[in-house]
From Swiss-Prot:
Protein name listed in UniProt: Glutamate racemase
Associated pathway: Cell wall biogenesis; peptidoglycan biosynthesis
One of the record's GO molecular function terms: glutamate racemase activity
Keywords: Cell shape, Cell wall biogenesis/degradation, Isomerase, Peptidoglycan synthesis
Species of the source: Aliivibrio fischeri (strain MJ11) (Vibrio fischeri)
Taxonomic lineage: Bacteria, Pseudomonadati, Pseudomonadota, Gammaproteobacteria, Vibrionales
Length: 261
């Protein structure tokens, strides 16, 4: 039997984390779930975030022999991890903005995240702990999250991304990608702010942690398993989404039927 890894996000940005884990554990069985009914998570209250993530993840854990859960969403990770860890008897891994590695290489840092992440005390505690003498500028953008989703189904977002990032022109030299959607906008960010800008995300570190918790054993056979993907509500972009997921070795989109309200 393969190890079953559940990756969860509000949208499809968590696929950036999936790619890193898949590289480390290519033969595991992957279940990807995203809560598109409540996308984007950056605009939800903490209580709603906890309720939705707990419900969806618990349902999938009852359907599959999940070995580990990865919350591939910075916004959710700052809120839901304690509740999930109390409820589940398997490891739950979250995403932390990569402030610490950024502070090791620069003192002109930009943290690009959702509005919710940049407002939370958790984020300021990270900065205080790991970058106390650095100039850390915060930019919270729901629009960039939406652009990443659009790009992943083939829509061009170059010029819009440049406008949203213009406040950082010549002000930062290192950017922490504090949302799992943003690795998909690396080219657009470099076009907007210059190719010399250093972009840092947490994907590789998460993959190493998952591998460690699974004792380095992603699978017990040499079979390549097709992943399964679930959304919380029907999507008008289903055809484009299925194309994206098929390229990443997932089956067709399945709907859990969990509306926003």
């Amino acid at each position: 039997m393969p190890k079953h890894i559940l990756i969860f996000d509000s949208g499809i940005g968590g696929l950036s984390v999936y790619k890193e884990i898949k590289y480390q554990l290519p033969l595991a069985k992957y279940i990807y779930a995203f809560d598109n009914a409540a996308f984007p998570y950056g605009e939800l209250t903490e209580s709603v975030l906890i309720e939705r993530t707990t419900h969806i993840i618990s349902e999938l854990c009852s359907q599959f022999p999940i070995d580990i859960v990865v919350i591939a969403c910075n916004t959710a990770s700052t809120v839901v991890l304690p509740s999930l860890r109390d409820k589940l008897d398997i490891p739950v891994v979250g995403v932390v903005p990569a402030i610490k590695p950024a502070a090791l290489v620069s003192n002109k840092i930009g943290l690009l995240a959702t509005p919710a992440t940049v407002k939370r005390s958790y984020t300021y505690d990270l900065i205080k702990s790991f970058a106390p003498i650095s100039d850390v500028q915060l930019l919270g953008s729901t629009r960039l999250v939406e652009m990443a989703e659009e790009k992943m189904i083939g829509i061009d977002v170059d010029m819009r991304a440049k406008r949203d990032l213009s406040p950082w022109q010549n002000k930062v030299d290192t950017i922490v990608l504090g949302c799992t959607h943003f690795p998909f906008l690396k080219n657009e960010i470099k076009k907007a702010l210059g190719n010399k800008i250093l972009l840092i995300d947490s994907g590789e570190a998460i993959a190493r942690r998952v591998k460690q918790l699974l004792n380095g054993d992603g699978v017990e056979s040499a079979v390549l398993f097709e992943g399964e993907v679930f959304c919380s509500a029907p999507s008008i972009k289903e055809e484009a989404l299925n194309h994206t997921f098929k390229e990443l070795n997932f089956s067709s989109l399945q709907c859990l039927g969990y509306p926003k309200f």
